[in-house]
């Protein structure tokens, strides 16, 4: 509803596809609050996700479409099919940029082999720097942009978190490894 009242040209809309809860697929992702979530990067699912997003957001295009979780190890949804579906959506003007989250250097190369990859989204912060070893050099080589997520480690690096800070039961921050007592103290000493 909010998008109905916003000048679309002043907003960058990005969304993700590839997690499926409408129907069962061969690749289980996880169960959340009793809802089973599957991974599905088939062309049919990607196109359905985009059409649903366009309708819900009252827009004719998405600026960035990310695949949320990759599935190449399962051999069920060929990367070529995933990329071709995204390229088709881009050619139709329904998406402007192709993105991928939770990738490896090989997956980045695969996207570029079968079509195009404009941007990846990976966890990157002062504490989580694994992207620097392979992903950043690969992206630099292939001209792929990088968008960091969780650069402040869910608030831990803001300087506002103390050893006395608690989070509500069920908060995802309780499961982050940095919030375990000993690691939490070490990190806070650095901040």
Residues of each region from the PLM?
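Conserved small/polar residues in nucleotide/adenosyl-binding loops
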Residues: 179-186
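Glycine-rich beta-alpha junction loops
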Residues: 17-19, 104, 124-128, 150-157
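Hydrophobic residues in well-ordered beta-strands that form the structural core
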Residues: 14-15, 100, 146-148
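Aromatic-lined glycan-binding groove of carbohydrate-active enzymes
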Residues: 132-171
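N-terminal binding-site loop/beta-alpha segment at the start of enzyme catalytic domains
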Residues: 1-21
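Glycine/proline-rich, positively charged
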Residues: 26-130, 134
């Amino acid at each position: 509803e909010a998008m109905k009242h916003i000048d679309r040209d002043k907003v960058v809309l990005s969304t993700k596809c590839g997690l499926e809860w409408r129907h069962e697929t061969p690749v289980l992702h996880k169960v959340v609050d009793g809802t089973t979530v599957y991974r599905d990067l088939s062309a049919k699912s990607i196109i359905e996700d985009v059409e649903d997003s366009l309708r819900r957001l009252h827009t004719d295009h998405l600026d960035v479409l990310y695949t949320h979780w990759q599935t190449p190890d399962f051999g069920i949804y060929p990367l070529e099919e995933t990329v071709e579906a995204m390229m088709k959506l881009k050619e139709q003007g329904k998406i402007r940029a192709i993105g991928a989250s939770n990738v490896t250097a090989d997956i980045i190369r695969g996207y570029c082999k079968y079509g195009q990859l404009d941007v990846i989204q990976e966890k990157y912060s002062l504490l989580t720097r694994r992207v620097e070893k392979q992903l950043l050099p690969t992206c630099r080589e292939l001209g792929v942009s990088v968008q960091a997520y969780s650069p402040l480690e869910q608030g831990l690096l803001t300087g506002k978190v103390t050893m006395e800070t608690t989070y509500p039961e069920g908060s995802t921050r309780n499961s982050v490894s940095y919030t375990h007592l000993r690691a939490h103290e070490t990190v806070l000493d650095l901040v």
